[in-house]
């Protein structure tokens, strides 16, 4: 497992489970006119009227807009007072996990802490890219690790990459914030040396803390 796998375990939550989703939809007897014919007729009408082109253009614009500026993570406030706590990344496994040689090192049903098997050698920063004070705070940071990631909860990805001269990520649907219990930003996540916990810090943007 690499750090990428560790991030996946952090995202999945306390219980990693798999389920058979079964078959989607219901089966109906064929009726006249059949559904395919109705769909084709509708598409033809849309194309002839020009509505198809307008809908496709609107769809493309929406996809581009959401990829550059995804919807903000709801429920995230602004850090006003420093605070910190420990986070236990342990998960319950839904299946055996094997190493590169196929040997099982963690079995289904066991509670596993990823930090037992791979160190968390990176620092995660969560900020609101629409807050100039938080962007300025991010520019002052000196990560204690060789690898770090800037994760937006709000803001424009390309604008922040240009402003911070760094690759920037976005917490789509607030998955990481929910998993790590982050409800305010700026926030920083790092490993606790020699321990099996992560440290989550909430740091006011105006504070000089690094």
Curated annotation (Swiss-Prot):
The keyword Magnesium does not apply. It is found in: Periplasm. Residues 1-18 form the signal peptide. Keywords: Conjugation, Periplasm, Plasmid, Signal. Disruption phenotype: No F pili expressed on cell surface. Pfam families: TraW_N. GO terms for cellular component: periplasmic space. Involved in F-pilus assembly. Required for F plasmid conjugative transfer. NCBIfam families: PRK13738.1, TraW. This is Protein TraW. It comes from Escherichia coli (strain K12).
